[in-house]
Amino acid sequence: MFEKGYVDENYVRIPKDELFSFVVRVLTKLGTPEEDAKIVADNLIMADLRGIESHGVQRLKRYVDGILSGGINLHPRIKIIREGPSYALLDGDEGFGQVVGYKAMKLAIEKARKTGIGIVAVRNSNHYGIAGYYALMAAEEGMIGISMTNSRPLVAPTGGVERILGTNPIALAAPTKGKPFLLDMATSVVPIGKLEVYRRKGEEIPEGWAINSKGEITRSVEEVFNGGSLLPLGGFGELLGGHKGYGLSLMVDILSGILSGGTWSKHVKNTNEKNSNVCHFFMAINIEHFTPLEEFKGRMSEMINEIKNSRKHPDFERIWIHGEKGFLTMETRLKLGIPIYKKVLDELNEIARRVGVKGLEV
């Protein structure tokens, strides 16, 4: 999504700091340590700032339910199970995925500073928000960052009709002379949160996103939520590369779940269930160990400019680079406020009443 500043009457704008404080209020009231609450809030707000509504504050109810059901451990003892100069294996002790992920990527960056590369695999965690958050942590330190996570089964494999794969996102960030390059994508056609957005709006989804329980392509959100499945990146069958998205999803499960000794998507549970056992994978690559950082940034910018200045299709205004829309949307929303769908605002204020904190005023 790229926002130029206009939103319709179904949205209200809320300043970033106000929304951040609200999330922290809710989480700390429920017993989350303030430092951890700020990490979770930062992750959610970054999603909304970048236009990723599916992973923004609309997800807060899921985390509140996870806390109240015992699915999220507010005081995890995050353990290093194995460690070497350039790698580590962590057990997240069912903590907030955002908190576990933040600490894991920090560790990967620290190791990359010393050895050139840092790899951290994580098991026994929870949903960690947007994958790009962690990849950008490395890019901001002048490194290449890679982040991925498995998730509960929502996607049918190519040729199947059963939910057996996760949406299993992948992110890679790299510094340039300007804003970082940021690829942040699900390995399904869309993440499940996109369907939740359409459900709230009462709209049909685009054709090609999902199938119903019989394996038929559907535009009905309810058919998807009632036994249907999302499709892997590339869509239905092999003609447009659905088997490639399927393969990328398995790659995430191998690096996140199987390598860590955790589990793969078929056996991952929802956030409000105990032992959801979400698994992550983080990598930081210290560019200076391979080539001078400024030279790398220059070459990145040169490549990007060549692509953006190449001949454009008449149906498109411009050629975008991954992450560019998100940074431009962030600039707009930092100035004007974050647009929140009114139904989401009602849900957030219901959460506030439920836990006993001040709600959001517009």
UniProtKB/Swiss-Prot annotation:
The UniProt record lists the EC number as 1.1.1.37
* Record's GO cellular component terms: cytoplasm
- What Gene3D superfamilies does the annotation carry? 1.10.1530.10, Hypothetical oxidoreductase yiak, domain 2
| An annotated Gene Ontology molecular function | L-malate dehydrogenase (NAD+) activity
Q: Where are the transmembrane segments?
A: none
| Cross-referenced InterPro entries | Mal/L-sulf/L-lact_DH-like_ah, Mal/L-sulf/L-lact_DH-like_NADP, Mal/L-sulfo/L-lacto_DH-like_sf, Malate/L-lactate_DH-like
For this protein, the record's Pfam families field holds:
Ldh_2
- Record localization: Cytoplasm
- The broad enzyme category this protein falls into is oxidoreductase
What is the catalytic activity of this protein?
A: (S)-malate + NAD(+) = oxaloacetate + NADH + H(+)
Assign the protein's first listed, main location to one coarse class: cytoplasm
Query: Is Ribosomal protein a UniProt keyword of this protein?
Result: no
Identify the keywords attached in UniProt to this record, alphabetized.
Answer: Cytoplasm, NAD, Oxidoreductase, Tricarboxylic acid cycle
Q: What are its GO biological-process terms?
A: tricarboxylic acid cycle
Keyword NAD among record annotations: yes
Q: Which family does it belong to?
A: Belongs to the LDH2/MDH2 oxidoreductase family.
The annotated subunit structure for this chain is: Homodimer.
Name assigned to this protein:
Malate dehydrogenase
